[in-house]
């Protein structure tokens, strides 16, 4: 068993070395062709690191490793804050069936929600005439009691 593990490790090491040699050749080839753009990339990276340094520790360390480490720690802190603050809202609600919903619904009790504007007249009455039918004429001519053809004379 020991022999097979050692040979597997040696094979992996060999593979790594082959890939790293190929990568170095590719990197050298690219760097000679794109030296100007890599300078621009380095400048952009430096600008962004300094902006991050201003956010994370404006009066502290200025080396890149410290700035990135503090940035990572601050992001982790913010992620934990999001978890803590959103935990009450993300708690699993028990699944309810339609029967349970109807048991607690207003319609099952013969009630419904009405906008407040519609209830102002009801609030001003004594309650006795709420269910009384409202007698409003459909036309002024239809309910003229003084006319000769009225059945209520």
Curated annotation (Swiss-Prot):
One of its GO terms (cellular component) is nucleus. The keyword Chloroplast does not apply. One of its GO terms (biological process) is response to gibberellin. It comes from the Eukaryota. This is Transcription factor bHLH154. PANTHER family: TRANSCRIPTION FACTOR BHLH154, TRANSCRIPTION FACTOR BHLH83-RELATED. One of its GO terms (molecular function) is protein dimerization activity. It is found in: Nucleus. Belongs to the bHLH protein family. The keyword Transferase does not apply. It comes from Arabidopsis thaliana.
């Amino acid at each position: 068993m020991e022999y097979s593990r050692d040979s597997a490790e040696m094979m992996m090491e060999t593979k790594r070395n082959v890939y790293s040699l190929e990568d170095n050749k590719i990197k050298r080839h690219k760097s000679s062709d794109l030296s100007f753009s890599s300078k621009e990339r380095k400048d952009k990276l430096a600008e962004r690191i300094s902006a991050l340094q201003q956010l994370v520790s404006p009066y502290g360390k200025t080396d890149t490793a410290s700035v990135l480490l503090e940035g990572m720690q601050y992001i982790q802190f913010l992620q934990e804050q999001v978890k803590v603050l959103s935990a009450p809202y993300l708690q699993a609600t028990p699944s309810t069936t339609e029967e349970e919903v109807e048991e607690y619904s207003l319609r099952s009790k013969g009630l419904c929600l009405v906008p407040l504007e519609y209830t102002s007249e009801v609030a001003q009455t004594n309650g006795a005439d709420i269910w009384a039918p409202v007698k409003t004429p459909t036309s002024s001519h239809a309910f003229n009691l003084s006319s000769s053809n009225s059945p209520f004379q």
